[in-house]
Amino acid sequence: MVTQYLLDTNAWIHYLKDPKSSIRGRLATISPRQVVTCSVVLSELLHGAEKYGNRIQRVDIIKSLLAPFSCLPFDEVDANVYASVRHDLELKGQVIGPYDLQIASICLRHGLLACDKQGL
């Protein structure tokens, strides 16, 4: 089975901001079929585009960047994973942000490796 990666929002931001990023180099060595994105990451990136000047240009860049990759939705099955994981974390006194938990839920359901700006 081929490993598939879901890059977190901060990984894509690092990719866009740093032409010499390790993420950019690693993506050049793997098949686009090994990388997926999700609706949560897309929404965070689009929100970032709304916050700054050149909104239309930024949205176009994001859409072009993510076009080669499948985009998984956060759906009802993922919501059930989210609820279970959040409950388990709360019992342990651990809390992570809701968007990160949504991304983690998608990764758990689909057997994906989550990657942040620290590396792919």
Range-by-range predicted roles:
Residues 12-13, 42-45, 79, 120:
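A generic structural signal for short hydrophobic patches within well-formed alpha-helices
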